[in-house]
């Protein structure tokens, strides 16, 4: 059975995290040649490439498995060493989260853990349809995802759902939808997406108004908070979580353009098994808070 040297695994991890050999060498305080040698040792041990040497480098499928193993070992080391030895160096927890969770419920959920535990968060923002892939690749130790099925050697629990409403400012609605939201009026109304892979708006329009993808003008803005600002200032109509705009809806600053219609995204919490003590704290905090503020039906 092949047992990797975790020092060499850390070199592979550093190349991926630092997006190159030079910065990985600086991070590890060794030469760039030494980084290359350690990775070559690993590749010789497993008889296959572990890195695709692109810019930036990315792990092969076997490399992903080894990085996932390293994440688990690091967390279990924290479990075994105990508070006395780990308290002086905060534990790094890399989590993949969607932008809307980060903008609404995630940080309040983690507040008790951050206040009581010596950890450093590395929150990697990704669409909820793709966060699980980061866990699969070993880039993170936990992920908020819409996928309900656990990966091999992982655990999953239901968090609850975010309900998305189709909203805009009153002046925007008067300009683009004077006779209500119709298929023809939607073709002229500017919308917004998080990135080119974000299909929330398009899926809603296709499902409820039979509009094919790509048929409406759409801005690309990588910020959940900016969606709210764009809607408030009358620039776009948007799909925004109800949880994020409760005050704006109550005050009338934003209006629900399609009462009775919404887009529901059920969220799940994925992480490696077995859980370390610290990850168990994170899990408990996320589930407790998520079950309070997210839809459970």
Curated annotation (Swiss-Prot):
What's the superkingdom here?
A: Bacteria
Q: List UniProt keywords, sorted A-Z.
A: DNA-binding, Transcription, Transcription regulation
Annotation: DNA-binding region: 21-40
What sequence ranges are listed for the domain HTH lysR-type?
A: 4-60
Enumerate the InterPro entries for this protein.
Answer: ArgP, ArgP_gammaproteobact, LTTR, LysR_subst-bd, Tscrpt_reg_HTH_LysR, WH-like_DNA-bd_sf, WH_DNA-bd_sf
Q: Which residues form a coiled coil?
A: none
Which pairs are disulfide-linked?
Answer: none
* Record-level Gene Ontology MF annotations: DNA binding; DNA-binding transcription factor activity
Recorded family membership: Belongs to the LysR transcriptional regulatory family.
Concerning HAMAP family, the annotation shows: HTH_type_ArgP
Described purpose of this protein according to its UniProt entry: Controls the transcription of genes involved in arginine and lysine metabolism.
- Subunit structure and binding partners: Homodimer.
The name on file for this protein is: HTH-type transcriptional regulator ArgP
Species in which this protein is naturally found: Salmonella arizonae (strain ATCC BAA-731 / CDC346-86 / RSK2980)
Name of the gene: argP
